[in-house]
């Protein structure tokens, strides 16, 4: 924790309408009717100080008024009280004028089901790191469920870090599926800011593939099918994942779950900045033309992940090339040869995912159906699916 970090008083934390560092765009979605209100906080990094605001919807839009807070009082305009709760109670008693506008506080907006508090979680053991912070293993206080906690390491001084964290929170709270990592909520009432997720006891698929090069083909097929079910669910929810890879699939009790939604967008088309770092090895060739990512660019990335699931021993895609070379080769039509031991039917699926024409790639739904059928054949012991790919010096077709 940063030295001399100002803490939020317990009586302020306990206010049902105190939403902590909830970002304005999220708060605005909750302030629906005239008179709806909440209290939020933010850190002024250069002063290392907390600021509190009363956010309220008026006829002309949402207003935010700073509440002056110290150890013994809270003040807004000419009104003051011993703390924020008492101040709000006095403001609710009548219509008041603030900065020349009539303000009536009608309905206090309470925290939603995904807005947890620090007292709701316990965590100590660090298990990894993510794009914007450290990941810990912990438990939910209410039911002792094992959780993974992503901690924003910048302690509220980095607005961009908080924005990235909340992008992930916004999309994850929309989804509930066995092959998607479960989202429990976010914590913004005080520092540190946290995301709370299901803990997956099997770790990342990539790590498993590295540790177990002798993993049986039927298990690899099963993992591929389960991942496709997760992608199909996301696409039906109008969401592009944009970061599909073996490292972003986790395993819990043998079930593969798609994870890491930091790049996920709830839209059918999302334009990326081609000047910024990209996951070149998983990127569909057409993205380099206009920067547009779509459902079929996810499918292309899924094809690369299929290759990851079957290469033995595990290695990164195009591991012998630098990113620039990968970009050139893939745009020119090159695709990696299928790994030895990959079932013929899986090779067909792989090539379909890698079709140079994005419109000829299978949808996530069709992909899931094909992989479900293949998985069922393996479960039934169908000998015909055990044959590996035919040897060929040619790359997969781009027809």
Stretches with model-predicted labels:
Residues 185-186:
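A short, aromatic-enriched beta-strand patch in the conserved N-lobe beta-sheet
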Residues 223-224:
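Activation segment signature within eukaryotic-like protein kinase domains
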Residues 1-132:
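Domain-scale recognition of modular recruitment/scaffold domains used in eukaryotic signaling
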Residues 134-156:
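Glycine-rich ATP phosphate-binding loop
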Residues 165-170:
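Regulatory alphaC helix of protein kinase catalytic domains
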Residues 190-204, 208:
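Conserved short submotifs of the Hanks-type protein kinase catalytic core
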Residues 235-251:
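Catalytic-loop of the protein kinase fold
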